Every structure is written in structure tokens, then in C-alpha cells.
Amino acid sequence: MTANFSTHVFSPQHCGCDRLTSIDDVRQCLTEYIYWSSYAYRNRQCAGQLYDTLLSFKDDAESVFIDVRELVKNMPWDNVKDCTEIIRCYIPDEQKTIREISAIIGLCAYAATYWGGEDHPTSNSLNALFVMLEMLNYMDYTIIFWRMN
């Protein structure tokens, strides 16, 4: 019997970056980040300064959503619409604060990590990405750009 080891390390474009150069890169960077979060730690590239900043958004998720780990476990991640409605119970305004925006990103990153696969994302971890994309708009990307840099 032989052991089967994965040698693939997921390495998205912005993972090793220190900052973004354009607001237009924010959505792509966040998409890559949530996707990256779906991989097991040993199967993804080490985070650079930019991703370290994004990882800190989990702290905002804990302050906005309180018991974020329980929320991540109990939300119906197989249903994007229901998840967005649950988040809107915590963050009802269309005009979100910078802390609320980063909390949404942090919550979805928690979910992607919790529900992620060993060497590839799962349907639930991908739905965490879709929830984030559903919750954020261009104004949110513009606001969060300044915190990311």
C-alpha cells in the first residue's frame, strides 16, 4: 500500500501581494481569497501582507456576528439566498460601514475554511463565495479597497 500525497498548492494571483493597485482589482482579489480559504492549510500558498489583512477581517466577523463559529456551522450554506437573508438580519442597511463590509468578508472566509475541502473547494465553501459576492456591491469594494491597502 502506498500513501497518496497531494503536491498541488493553490497559489492565486494576489496571495503574495502586499497591496492592490486599483479598486477594479478588489472583487477579483476577494474572490481568490475566499477560494484560497477553501483549501486545507497545507494545500495553499502562504499568505502575503494583503491576505494577512484579509485574514484580520475574521476579527470583525467575530465582533459583528458574535458567535461566528456557531453561525458558520448552523447557516444553510447550501442555500445562498437564505444565507444572505440571515446576514441581512445582522447588517440590514444597504449602506454598510467598513467594519460591516469586512465582517461579511471575514464570515465568508470562516465558512470557506470550515466547509472547505482537502485539495479543492466544496459546494458549501463555494457558496460562501457566492454569498459574499451577493452581499457586496461596487461601493463596498471601493470602501474596502482603502482598508486593504
Swiss-Prot record:
Signal peptide: none annotated. GO terms for biological process: symbiont-mediated suppression of host NF-kappaB cascade. Keywords: Early protein, Host-virus interaction, Inhibition of host NF-kappa-B by virus. Disulfide bonds: none annotated. Pfam families: Poxv_Bcl-2-like (PF06227). The keyword DNA repair does not apply. Contributes to virulence by binding to the host IKBKB subunit of the IKK complex and preventing host NF-kappa-B activation in response to pro-inflammatory stimuli such as TNF-alpha or IL1B. Mechanistically, sterically hinders the direct contact between the kinase domains of IKBKB in the IKK complex containing IKBKB, CHUK/IKKA and NEMO. Homodimers. Interacts with host IKBKB; this interaction inhibits host NF-kappa-B activation. Belongs to the orthopoxvirus OPG200 family. This is Protein OPG200. The gene is OPG200.
